[in-house]
């Protein structure tokens, strides 16, 4: 199948399923099961419930899709996990 035949949708991850699969609520209102694309696995991009994602689907099977992109959070300060514990000191060579 040529890449021109694939359809892209945006949606919201509602549930994480076993085997790197996700239940995704599309913006159009449909709910599908999507799996993580190989490049996302290779680059260790983690997807959590509540993330906005882009899904690639075949026009022949509109119940399954491939998760190809996780959108960055629009929340302020969402640039990483918060650190816990005391602040670190400066690095000193011996």
Swiss-Prot record:
Region described as Disordered: 71-94
Protein name: Translation initiation factor IF-1
HAMAP family: IF_1
Physiological role: One of the essential components for the initiation of protein synthesis. Stabilizes the binding of IF-2 and IF-3 on the 30S subunit to which N-formylmethionyl-tRNA(fMet) subsequently binds. Helps modulate mRNA selection, yielding the 30S pre-initiation complex (PIC). Upon addition of the 50S ribosomal subunit IF-1, IF-2 and IF-3 are released leaving the mature 70S translation initiation complex.
Domain S1-like, first and last residues per copy: 1-72
InterPro entries assigned to the protein according to its UniProt record, in alphabetical order: NA-bd_OB-fold, RNA-binding_domain_S1_IF1, TIF_IF1
Subcellular location: Cytoplasm
Short name of one Pfam family: eIF-1a
GO MF annotation terms: ribosome binding; rRNA binding; translation initiation factor activity
CDD domains: S1_IF1 (cd04451)
Self-association state and partner proteins as the record states: Component of the 30S ribosomal translation pre-initiation complex which assembles on the 30S ribosome in the order IF-2 and IF-3, IF-1 and N-formylmethionyl-tRNA(fMet); mRNA recruitment can occur at any time during PIC assembly.
Family of the protein in this entry: Belongs to the IF-1 family.
Presence of the UniProt keyword Nucleotide-binding in the record: no
Any one Gene Ontology cellular component term annotated for this protein: cytosol
PROSITE patterns per UniProt: S1_IF1_TYPE
Keywords: Cytoplasm, Initiation factor, Protein biosynthesis, RNA-binding, rRNA-binding
